[in-house]
C-alpha cells in the first residue's frame, strides 16, 4: 500500500470526492451518465445505505483516491461491495486494501456471502478478487437499443397501461417487484421506504414507471430512468417484471415495449438495460426487440461460514 495512504470511514464532506472517483472508475467523464454531487448525495441518503458506517475512502495527501461502499441485504444474508480506485493510483495495493475493508465489514454484518461486480475485461480486478478467495458465479449482459422504430405493446382484452402515482403506488410497486423477482438470483426484497426513496431520485419520473393492469389489478411493471446532458440523453430500463400469476400471456414484451415507447417519446438517443446471461426468456425477448449485447460484467462471490446463534 502506498506510504501515507489511509483508509477511513466516509464523511458527508467526501460526497464530491467520491462522485469524482465514481465517474472516473466507470469512465463516465463528461458524458450524460456522469453523476453530479447532488445525485450522489441523494443516492447515499437512501434508507439502509448508511454510508457513515458502510462506506470507506482511501485518502493520500488529503486527496480521496478510492472508495468502497458495502450494501447490506439482511433478508437474504448478502452484502455487495462496489467502488474502485482512480486510474493514476491503481496497481499500488489500494484496491486490495479497500476490498479487505469490505470483507471485514461483511464478516461483522454476519452475512453468508459478499458479492462484487466487475467488468469481464477487468483482468486486474479479477486477479485481485481471485487471490482474495472470491470465485466467479454469474454473468450479466449489458444491452443497448439504437432503433428508430418503436415496438408497440399488444395487450389482451381487459388489460391497460397506466403510470405510477407518487404518494399512492409505493406499496403496490414494492409488492409487485418483490413477488416478480422473489426467485431471482441476488434479489433482496424491498421495503416501501426504500421504494419511496428511489422513485423520488432526480433521474426518475413517475410517468416513467408503468404498470400493466388487469381490470385494475397490477400484473406487470417497467421502471425506467433517464440520464441527460445538453447534447445527449440515454434511457434505461432499470427493472421490469411480471407477476407470477400473469406469466405466459405476453405481458413481458408488452411492458418493455411500453417503457421503450415512453423513453423514445422523451427524446432519448439510446436505451440500455442489463440482464442475467442465464435468464434465457428475458435475454431472448430483448434480442427480439432489437437490443444488442455491448458489454458483460461478472459477479464474484466470497462465502462465509454459516453462523449459529
Indicate residue ranges for each PLM-predicted region:
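A short beta-loop-alpha structural element at the N-terminal edge
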Residues: 5-18, 160-175
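Conserved donor-binding loop and adjoining core beta-sheet/short helix segment
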Residues: 12-15, 23-109, 118-119, 219-233
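Helix-loop element at the rim of GNAT/NAT acetyltransferase active sites that forms part
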Residues: 20-35, 43-47, 167, 175-189, ...
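Acyl-donor-binding surface of acyltransferase catalytic domains
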Residues: 72-78, 86-158, 300-302
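Conserved hydrophobic beta-strand within the GNAT/NAT acetyltransferase core sheet
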Residues: 81-83, 114-117, 237, 271-275
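Conserved acetyl-CoA-binding loop-helix of GNAT-fold acetyltransferases
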Residues: 91-104, 239-242, 248-265, 284-288
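C-terminal "cap" of GNAT-fold acetyltransferases
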Residues: 142-164, 169, 269, 274-280, ...
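Phosphate-binding active sites in nucleotide-utilizing proteins
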Residues: 182-224
